[in-house]
Amino acid sequence: MIVRNDTLWMAQEAFTSGQAYDRAHWAAYTRHDYAVFNPVHTWIEYINRLLGALLGFPVLLATGWTLVRSKSHPKWALTMVAALLVLGFEAWLGKVVVDGNLIPHQITYHMAGAFALLGLLTAVYRSVSSEWELHALRAEREVEGLEADRRAAYPLFMGLIALLSVQIILGTQVREEVDALVKAFGLYADRSDWVAQLPVGLLVHRSFSLLILALSYYLYRKTAGLGGLKVRAAFVLYALLAETALGAAMYYFAIPRILQPVHLLLSAVSWFLLVDGAFKAWLMLRKG
Protein backbone atom coordinates (compact mmCIF):
# COMPACT_ATOMS: atom_id res chain seq x y z
CA MET A 1 0.00 0.00 0.00
CA ILE A 2 1.26 3.49 -0.86
CA VAL A 3 0.18 7.10 -0.44
CA ARG A 4 0.04 9.20 -3.61
CA ASN A 5 -1.63 12.60 -3.95
CA ASP A 6 -3.06 12.28 -0.40
CA THR A 7 -4.83 9.06 -1.40
CA LEU A 8 -4.21 5.46 -0.36
CA TRP A 9 -3.49 2.99 -3.18
CA MET A 10 -3.45 -0.79 -2.84
CA ALA A 11 -1.54 -3.17 -5.09
CA GLN A 12 -3.90 -5.30 -7.19
CA GLU A 13 -1.40 -8.14 -7.43
CA ALA A 14 2.16 -9.05 -6.42
CA PHE A 15 4.71 -7.31 -8.64
CA THR A 16 8.18 -5.78 -8.59
CA SER A 17 8.01 -2.01 -8.56
CA GLY A 18 10.34 0.13 -10.61
CA GLN A 19 11.38 3.75 -10.43
CA ALA A 20 8.21 5.06 -12.08
CA TYR A 21 4.65 4.83 -10.80
CA ASP A 22 2.48 2.59 -12.98
CA ARG A 23 -1.22 3.26 -12.39
CA ALA A 24 -2.18 -0.14 -13.86
CA HIS A 25 -0.77 -1.94 -10.80
CA TRP A 26 -2.73 0.05 -8.24
CA ALA A 27 -6.36 0.52 -7.17
CA ALA A 28 -7.71 3.21 -4.87
CA TYR A 29 -8.23 1.97 -1.29
CA THR A 30 -11.80 2.92 -0.38
CA ARG A 31 -12.36 1.30 3.04
CA HIS A 32 -11.26 4.53 4.74
CA ASP A 33 -9.61 7.81 3.81
CA TYR A 34 -6.86 8.08 6.43
CA ALA A 35 -4.13 8.83 3.90
CA VAL A 36 -2.95 11.83 5.92
CA PHE A 37 -1.65 10.82 9.35
CA ASN A 38 -3.69 12.35 12.19
CA PRO A 39 -1.91 11.98 15.56
CA VAL A 40 -5.02 13.02 17.55
CA HIS A 41 -7.15 10.27 15.98
CA THR A 42 -4.33 7.78 16.46
CA TRP A 43 -3.92 8.56 20.16
CA ILE A 44 -7.68 8.47 20.78
CA GLU A 45 -7.96 5.08 19.10
CA TYR A 46 -4.91 3.78 20.98
CA ILE A 47 -6.27 4.91 24.37
CA ASN A 48 -9.70 3.50 23.51
CA ARG A 49 -8.26 0.07 22.73
CA LEU A 50 -5.92 0.18 25.72
CA LEU A 51 -8.78 0.95 28.12
CA GLY A 52 -10.86 -1.80 26.51
CA ALA A 53 -8.07 -4.31 27.08
CA LEU A 54 -7.55 -3.14 30.68
CA LEU A 55 -11.29 -3.49 31.34
CA GLY A 56 -11.11 -7.13 30.31
CA PHE A 57 -8.81 -8.12 33.19
CA PRO A 58 -11.06 -7.07 36.13
CA VAL A 59 -14.13 -8.45 34.34
CA LEU A 60 -12.35 -11.77 33.80
CA LEU A 61 -11.17 -11.88 37.43
CA ALA A 62 -14.62 -10.96 38.74
CA THR A 63 -16.18 -13.66 36.58
CA GLY A 64 -13.79 -16.24 38.02
CA TRP A 65 -14.53 -15.08 41.57
CA THR A 66 -18.30 -15.31 41.08
CA LEU A 67 -17.97 -18.76 39.51
CA VAL A 68 -16.14 -19.93 42.63
CA ARG A 69 -19.06 -18.62 44.70
CA SER A 70 -21.71 -19.79 42.24
CA LYS A 71 -23.32 -22.22 44.70
CA SER A 72 -24.11 -19.47 47.20
CA HIS A 73 -24.69 -16.68 44.65
CA PRO A 74 -25.61 -18.20 41.27
CA LYS A 75 -27.09 -14.94 39.95
CA TRP A 76 -23.77 -13.18 40.41
CA ALA A 77 -22.03 -15.84 38.33
CA LEU A 78 -24.64 -15.78 35.56
CA THR A 79 -24.58 -11.99 35.37
CA MET A 80 -20.77 -11.83 35.23
CA VAL A 81 -20.60 -14.54 32.56
CA ALA A 82 -23.12 -12.51 30.54
CA ALA A 83 -21.01 -9.37 31.10
CA LEU A 84 -17.87 -11.19 29.91
CA LEU A 85 -19.65 -12.36 26.75
CA VAL A 86 -20.98 -8.86 26.06
CA LEU A 87 -17.47 -7.44 26.58
CA GLY A 88 -16.05 -9.90 24.06
CA PHE A 89 -18.79 -9.00 21.58
CA GLU A 90 -18.08 -5.29 22.15
CA ALA A 91 -14.37 -5.78 21.50
CA TRP A 92 -15.10 -7.55 18.21
CA LEU A 93 -17.76 -5.05 17.12
CA GLY A 94 -15.51 -2.12 18.01
CA LYS A 95 -12.88 -3.47 15.63
CA VAL A 96 -15.52 -3.88 12.91
CA VAL A 97 -16.72 -0.29 13.41
CA VAL A 98 -13.18 1.10 13.17
CA ASP A 99 -12.18 -1.09 10.22
CA GLY A 100 -15.35 -0.05 8.41
CA ASN A 101 -14.67 3.66 9.05
CA LEU A 102 -17.71 4.18 11.33
CA ILE A 103 -20.26 2.06 9.49
CA PRO A 104 -23.80 3.44 10.03
CA HIS A 105 -26.05 1.44 12.40
CA GLN A 106 -23.10 -0.55 13.74
CA ILE A 107 -22.24 2.46 15.90
CA THR A 108 -25.72 2.18 17.42
CA TYR A 109 -25.24 -1.54 18.06
CA HIS A 110 -21.84 -0.84 19.60
CA MET A 111 -23.29 1.83 21.87
CA ALA A 112 -26.21 -0.38 22.90
CA GLY A 113 -23.77 -3.15 23.81
CA ALA A 114 -21.69 -0.74 25.90
CA PHE A 115 -24.72 0.35 27.90
CA ALA A 116 -25.85 -3.26 28.31
CA LEU A 117 -22.41 -4.07 29.72
CA LEU A 118 -22.62 -1.10 32.08
CA GLY A 119 -26.05 -2.25 33.23
CA LEU A 120 -24.87 -5.80 33.95
CA LEU A 121 -21.83 -4.64 35.90
CA THR A 122 -23.94 -2.14 37.84
CA ALA A 123 -26.42 -4.87 38.76
CA VAL A 124 -23.62 -7.06 40.13
CA TYR A 125 -22.12 -4.13 42.02
CA ARG A 126 -25.45 -3.27 43.62
CA SER A 127 -26.16 -6.90 44.49
CA VAL A 128 -22.75 -7.34 46.15
CA SER A 129 -22.93 -4.05 48.04
CA SER A 130 -26.44 -4.90 49.23
CA GLU A 131 -24.88 -7.59 51.42
CA TRP A 132 -23.33 -4.77 53.41
CA GLU A 133 -26.54 -2.71 53.47
CA LEU A 134 -28.84 -5.53 54.55
CA HIS A 135 -28.88 -4.64 58.24
CA ALA A 136 -29.42 -0.95 57.49
CA LEU A 137 -32.38 -1.75 55.26
CA ARG A 138 -33.97 -3.95 57.91
CA ALA A 139 -33.43 -1.30 60.58
CA GLU A 140 -35.03 1.49 58.52
CA ARG A 141 -37.96 2.97 60.41
CA GLU A 142 -41.41 2.49 58.96
CA VAL A 143 -43.20 5.82 58.48
CA GLU A 144 -46.58 6.61 57.00
CA GLY A 145 -46.63 6.00 53.25
CA LEU A 146 -43.06 4.66 53.14
CA GLU A 147 -43.99 1.18 51.90
CA ALA A 148 -46.23 2.63 49.18
CA ASP A 149 -43.42 4.94 48.05
CA ARG A 150 -41.03 2.00 47.96
CA ARG A 151 -43.36 0.12 45.68
CA ALA A 152 -43.82 3.16 43.43
CA ALA A 153 -40.10 3.91 43.13
CA TYR A 154 -39.10 0.65 41.45
CA PRO A 155 -41.43 0.90 38.41
CA LEU A 156 -40.49 4.57 38.06
CA PHE A 157 -36.80 3.70 37.90
CA MET A 158 -37.53 0.93 35.38
CA GLY A 159 -39.69 3.24 33.29
CA LEU A 160 -36.92 5.82 33.16
CA ILE A 161 -34.43 3.12 32.16
CA ALA A 162 -36.69 2.13 29.25
CA LEU A 163 -37.17 5.75 28.15
CA LEU A 164 -33.48 6.57 28.46
CA SER A 165 -32.63 3.46 26.41
CA VAL A 166 -34.84 4.74 23.59
CA GLN A 167 -33.33 8.21 23.96
CA ILE A 168 -29.79 6.84 23.74
CA ILE A 169 -30.61 4.94 20.55
CA LEU A 170 -32.18 8.08 19.04
CA GLY A 171 -29.12 10.09 20.05
CA THR A 172 -26.73 7.55 18.56
CA GLN A 173 -28.61 7.69 15.26
CA VAL A 174 -28.30 11.50 15.30
CA ARG A 175 -24.59 11.08 15.97
CA GLU A 176 -24.32 8.80 12.91
CA GLU A 177 -25.85 11.57 10.79
CA VAL A 178 -23.35 14.06 12.22
CA ASP A 179 -20.52 11.64 11.38
CA ALA A 180 -21.78 11.53 7.80
CA LEU A 181 -21.61 15.34 7.65
CA VAL A 182 -18.09 15.27 9.12
CA LYS A 183 -17.07 12.77 6.46
CA ALA A 184 -18.61 14.92 3.72
CA PHE A 185 -17.37 18.36 4.82
CA GLY A 186 -14.45 17.68 7.15
CA LEU A 187 -13.93 17.70 10.91
CA TYR A 188 -13.04 21.40 11.05
CA ALA A 189 -15.68 22.64 8.60
CA ASP A 190 -18.18 25.36 9.49
CA ARG A 191 -21.11 23.63 11.24
CA SER A 192 -23.52 26.55 11.31
CA ASP A 193 -26.02 24.92 8.92
CA TRP A 194 -25.55 21.28 9.95
CA VAL A 195 -28.52 21.17 12.33
CA ALA A 196 -30.84 22.10 9.45
CA GLN A 197 -29.50 19.13 7.45
CA LEU A 198 -30.20 16.57 10.17
CA PRO A 199 -33.33 14.39 9.84
CA VAL A 200 -36.52 14.63 11.89
CA GLY A 201 -35.06 12.16 14.40
CA LEU A 202 -33.20 15.09 15.95
CA LEU A 203 -36.49 16.82 16.81
CA VAL A 204 -37.85 13.60 18.30
CA HIS A 205 -34.65 13.22 20.33
CA ARG A 206 -34.91 16.81 21.56
CA SER A 207 -38.59 16.62 22.51
CA PHE A 208 -38.23 13.20 24.13
CA SER A 209 -35.78 14.69 26.62
CA LEU A 210 -38.56 16.81 28.12
CA LEU A 211 -40.62 13.71 28.92
CA ILE A 212 -37.61 12.07 30.56
CA LEU A 213 -36.90 15.20 32.61
CA ALA A 214 -40.51 15.40 33.79
CA LEU A 215 -40.53 11.75 34.87
CA SER A 216 -37.16 12.10 36.62
CA TYR A 217 -38.48 15.08 38.61
CA TYR A 218 -41.55 13.05 39.58
CA LEU A 219 -39.25 10.22 40.70
CA TYR A 220 -37.25 12.70 42.78
CA ARG A 221 -40.40 13.91 44.53
CA LYS A 222 -41.71 10.37 45.00
CA THR A 223 -38.55 9.12 46.73
CA ALA A 224 -38.72 11.66 49.57
CA GLY A 225 -37.94 9.85 52.83
CA LEU A 226 -36.37 6.83 51.16
CA GLY A 227 -32.78 7.61 52.08
CA GLY A 228 -30.43 6.23 49.44
CA LEU A 229 -33.10 6.26 46.74
CA LYS A 230 -33.69 9.97 47.27
CA VAL A 231 -29.99 10.66 46.74
CA ARG A 232 -29.87 8.52 43.59
CA ALA A 233 -33.01 10.15 42.19
CA ALA A 234 -31.47 13.57 42.82
CA PHE A 235 -28.25 12.61 41.03
CA VAL A 236 -30.29 11.23 38.12
CA LEU A 237 -32.23 14.49 37.87
CA TYR A 238 -29.06 16.61 37.97
CA ALA A 239 -27.28 14.44 35.40
CA LEU A 240 -30.27 14.52 33.05
CA LEU A 241 -30.59 18.30 33.46
CA ALA A 242 -26.92 18.74 32.55
CA GLU A 243 -27.24 16.32 29.65
CA THR A 244 -30.32 18.13 28.31
CA ALA A 245 -28.60 21.51 28.68
CA LEU A 246 -25.63 20.26 26.66
CA GLY A 247 -27.98 18.86 24.03
CA ALA A 248 -29.69 22.24 23.75
CA ALA A 249 -26.29 23.94 23.48
CA MET A 250 -25.32 21.63 20.62
CA TYR A 251 -28.64 22.34 18.88
CA TYR A 252 -28.43 26.12 19.16
CA PHE A 253 -24.65 26.59 18.85
CA ALA A 254 -23.84 24.50 15.77
CA ILE A 255 -22.81 21.21 17.44
CA PRO A 256 -19.51 22.21 19.12
CA ARG A 257 -17.10 19.28 18.91
CA ILE A 258 -16.09 19.45 22.58
CA LEU A 259 -19.69 19.00 23.79
CA GLN A 260 -20.38 15.73 21.96
CA PRO A 261 -18.26 13.42 24.17
CA VAL A 262 -19.40 15.20 27.36
CA HIS A 263 -23.04 14.74 26.32
CA LEU A 264 -22.38 11.04 25.79
CA LEU A 265 -20.54 10.72 29.11
CA LEU A 266 -23.50 12.21 30.99
CA SER A 267 -25.86 9.74 29.34
CA ALA A 268 -23.66 6.90 30.61
CA VAL A 269 -23.65 8.42 34.12
CA SER A 270 -27.45 8.75 34.03
CA TRP A 271 -27.79 5.13 32.89
CA PHE A 272 -25.53 3.90 35.70
CA LEU A 273 -27.46 5.86 38.34
CA LEU A 274 -30.81 4.59 37.06
CA VAL A 275 -29.76 0.93 36.97
CA ASP A 276 -28.19 1.28 40.41
CA GLY A 277 -31.31 2.96 41.78
CA ALA A 278 -33.67 0.41 40.22
CA PHE A 279 -31.71 -2.49 41.67
CA LYS A 280 -31.58 -0.87 45.11
CA ALA A 281 -35.34 -0.20 44.99
CA TRP A 282 -35.94 -3.85 44.12
CA LEU A 283 -33.74 -4.97 47.01
CA MET A 284 -35.59 -2.66 49.40
CA LEU A 285 -38.88 -4.24 48.38
CA ARG A 286 -37.47 -7.73 48.80
CA LYS A 287 -35.64 -7.18 52.06
CA GLY A 288 -37.36 -4.19 53.59
Name each model feature, range by range.
Residues 167-212, 217-221:
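Membrane-interfacial catalytic/cofactor-binding modules of polytopic membrane enzymes
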Residues 2-57, 199-205:
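Individual transmembrane alpha-helix segments
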